[in-house]
Regions:
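Small-polar-interrupted transmembrane alpha-helices in polytopic inner-membrane proteins
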Residues: 1-2, 16, 20
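Membrane-helix exit/interface motif
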Residues: 2-6, 26-33
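Hydrophobic/aromatic-rich structural module bridging two neighboring secondary-structure elements via a short loop
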Residues: 5-13
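Membrane-embedded alpha-helical hairpins and interfacial helices in multi-pass inner-membrane proteins
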Residues: 10, 29-184
Length: 184
């Protein structure tokens, strides 16, 4: 995990993330019975949200890179997964796409999902250097000490989605109209 010096190289992490993303796309489009399975519009909503989330992840990396860039792959994967989840929910018309909804959803998703995965990855990578292995006590300590960092990261992601989320979604909507991804 540490710049290709651990059990996984960054390229391998990217490949696993891409496979997970594609599996999520296949799962998100599996419920559409009336539309042909090869029709791209089935998964267009989640794809647009994943692209918006990846752009937000890249912008947050450019403005706040931090001292350690070894978790860049994790950041992209989790932002993409959060975008996919947002796309599935927005596609089913359960949530309106406004600044407040995007902000709340981003905060909760980054705090719970991204923070949870990062804390587990810290436990897994740290257990390789100790003889103790995994324990629930270690996981509890990691989650409690990680709350301030998870809150800060969720807050920053929320700010970026409130500022840049709707303009990016509007631009992607224009692209969808321009290239005829909408059915008339």
């Amino acid at each position: 995990f540490f710049q290709g010096q651990g059990a996984w190289t960054p390229w391998q992490m990217f490949c696993w993330g891409l496979l997970g993303f594609l599996a999520g796309l296949a799962f998100a489009g599996a419920q559409a019975d009336k539309i042909k399975s090869r029709n791209f519009t089935v998964v267009l909503g989640p794809v647009v949200c994943v692209i918006a989330a990846e752009i937000a992840a890249y912008l947050s990396y450019l403005l706040f890179p931090g001292g350690d860039t070894s978790f860049w792959g994790w950041r992209l994967y989790i932002f993409g997964a959060a975008g996919l989840l947002a796309g599935v929910l927005l596609q089913r018309k359960r949530l309106p796409a406004d600044e407040i909804t995007l902000g709340i959803f981003t905060f909760l998703t980054v705090f719970i999902i991204y923070g949870g995965i990062m804390n587990i990855s810290t436990l897994v990578t740290g257990a390789a250097f100790t003889a103790e292995g995994f324990s629930w006590e270690q996981m509890k300590i990691l989650y409690l000490t990680g709350v301030p960092f998870d809150m800060l990261h969720a807050f920053r992601a929320t700010v970026f989605m409130v500022l840049f989320g709707n303009p990016i979604i509007r631009k992607l909507e224009r692209i969808k109209i321009k290239y005829g991804f909408y059915r008339v």
